[in-house]
Amino acid sequence: RVAVQETDLYVQALKPLEDITRELILKHRGYIEKYIKTHPEFLDALEPWRDRGPAPVIICDMVSAGQKAGVGPMAAVAGAIAEHVGADLLKYTVEVVVENGGDIFLKTDNPVTMGIVAGTSSLSMRMGRCIKSKEKPVGVCTSSGTVGHSLSLGKADAICVVSDSCSLADAAATSIGNRLKSK
C-alpha cells in the first residue's frame, strides 16, 4: 500500500515496488495538480471538458473518458491514476494489480475473480466477475452513491464497469451511477 495525499494505492506485483510506485504517484498527481493550477475550473467540472490545447497524457485520457461518458474529467481521476501508475509499473514487472478506491488496473497471466462490494446491499460480495487480462491490461471500476467518499449524483450501491481503459471504466461507472436515482 502506498499513499500520497488523497491517492491511496494498493499494489500487488511479483516483487516489491513501493518506492517506484510512490515516485509514479507523485509524477502523475503532479501533472494533474499543475493542470488544475492553470485551469482551476477543471477540478469541479461536472460536464464534459472541452479540449483546451496541449495537456499531459493523463489529462487527455481523463478528458476523453469524461466526454465519452458524459461526465466531468475528475470522474475519471482515480481510474486514470491507477491506469497510468499501473502501466508504468509494467516496465518493472509482467503482472500488476493497482487498486485506487475501488478502481483497478489489472494485468495478470491468470484469470482473476473479482467480488463487488456494494455496502449494506444484500448483493455485496455475492457477485463476482472473472477477469482475463493476459493479453492486455484491463480496467475494472466501481462507483457507488452509498459507499465511499466520491461524488455521486445517484443512489446505486455499486456500478461496476470493465474496459480496456481504466479511465473510461471509471467515468462510465460514475455516469451510470449518476442516472440511478432510486434503489
Model segments located where?
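A structural signal for small-residue-enriched, beta-sheet-centric alpha/beta enzyme cores
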Residues: 1-16, 49, 115-117, 121-183
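Short glycine-rich, polar/acidic loop-and-turn segments at beta strand-coil junctions
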Residues: 13-15, 36, 102
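Alpha/propeptide regions of enzymes that mature by internal proteolysis
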Residues: 18-98, 162-183
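Glycine-rich anion/phosphate-binding loop at the beta-strand->alpha-helix junction
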Residues: 67-148, 152, 162
